[in-house]
Amino acid sequence: MIRIAIDCMGGDFGLPVTIPAAIEFARQFPDTRLLLVGLPDAIEAALAERRDAPRDRLDIVPATEVVSMDDPVEVALRRKKDSSMRLAAQAVKDGRADACISAGNTGAWMAISRYVLKTLDGIDRPAIATSIPNQTGRATTVLDLGANVDCSAEHLLQFAIMGAALSQAVDHRDRPTVGLLNIGEEIIKGNEVVKEAAELLRASPLNFYGNVEGNDIFKGTVDVVVCDGFVGNVVLKSVEGLAKMLSSVIREEFKRNFITLLAGAFAKPVLNRLRNRVDNRRYNGAALLGLRGVVIKSHGSADAYAFGFALQRAREAVASKLLERTAQTVAQITQRVQSGEAVAPGAAGDTA
C-alpha cells in the first residue's frame, strides 16, 4: 500500500480542489492510502459532500494551523509548527507516509521539507524538477525551477545527477541524456559558472550531451535540461504563459465568423489531441529532489484535475523507488567524480 500525505489546506483554493482530487485518485488507485492533513472539521465537511469517497483509505490527520500563500518562510517554518504543510512532511519523516504533496507556498514548502527531512548525502541543495512536453510526444525533465537562484558549478552537477535519476526512475529511460541550458551550443558560450559546470559534466559518468538552448527543451534534444533556479523559473513561467496565450488566440480565431466556426468543428478532434499533448495540467507535480523523502509540489492554481496528476507523480515516484535510486545514483556518481574517474570515451557527446 502506497501512502501519500496531502496538505489539504495549501494552494489558491485549498479543500475545494484537494478533497475532490484525493477522492478521485483513491478510487482510481486502490493500492493507495491518503493522509488528509488539515483542519479536521473542514475536511470532514468536505468529505461528507461526497458519498463516493472510499473512507476506509482516507485518514484525517488534524492540524491547527495553515500556511498561507503570503506567509514569509520564517513564519511558516518557525511559528506555524502545527500547520498542515509541516505535518504532511513530518508524516514522511515519521514513516507514516511514503510521499507528501502540497500546492501551497513554494518557498515555505521547500524550507519546511528541507528542515524536516534533510538532504541526501552528497547533495548541498534540493532542486525543483518537472516535465515539459516536447514535440517527440514525450517530455523533457527540467531543473532547477526556482529553489536556487544563485548556483555554483558543483550545484549544477548535483542537479544533473538528480535529474538523471528522476528520468531513469519515473520516465523509464535507461541512460538519459543531459544538457546544460546555455545561450549557445559552443563551449565558449555562457558565464564562468556555466562553463565550469560544463567541464564537470563532461568529466562525469553522466551521459552529457553538451550545451543546449531554450528551443531544445521543446524539440526533445535531450532527456534532462539543467539550469539555475532563476533561469529555470523564467523558462517555466514563459511556457505556462505561452500555452495560455495560444489557447486563447486559437479560441478567438475559430469564433471569428461562421466559416471559422465551421472549420473549428471539423478541426475539433485534432485540436483536442493537441490540447491533451500540451495541457500543462497533465504535467502538474514538480519533484523536490535531493531530500530524504519523496516531496511533490503542485501548482498553486491547480484545479482538481491537475492536482490529481500531481498525486500520480507522487505515486509513480514511490512505486519506482525514486528516493532509493536517487540516493544510490548520487552516491555512485559522486564517488566516481571525486576519484577522478571520467566517462568512458564515446559515452557522452558534445555538440560544440
From Swiss-Prot:
Signal peptide: none annotated. Its main location: cytoplasm. It is found in: Cytoplasm. Disulfide bonds: none annotated. Keywords: Cytoplasm, Lipid biosynthesis, Lipid metabolism, Phospholipid biosynthesis, Phospholipid metabolism, Transferase. GO terms for cellular component: cytoplasm. It comes from the Bacteria. InterPro entries: FA_synthesis (IPR003664), Phospholipid_synth_PlsX-like (IPR012281). It is an enzyme of class 2 (transferase). One of its GO terms (molecular function) is phosphate:acyl-[acyl carrier protein] acyltransferase activity. Pathway: Lipid metabolism; phospholipid metabolism. One of its GO terms (biological process) is fatty acid biosynthetic process. It holds the Pfam family FA_synthesis. Its EC number is 2.3.1.274. It catalyses: a fatty acyl-[ACP] + phosphate = an acyl phosphate + holo-[ACP]. Homodimer. Probably interacts with PlsY. Belongs to the PlsX family. Catalyzes the reversible formation of acyl-phosphate (acyl-PO(4)) from acyl-[acyl-carrier-protein] (acyl-ACP). This enzyme utilizes acyl-ACP as fatty acyl donor, but not acyl-CoA. This is Phosphate acyltransferase. It comes from Bordetella parapertussis (strain 12822 / ATCC BAA-587 / NCTC 13253). The gene is plsX.
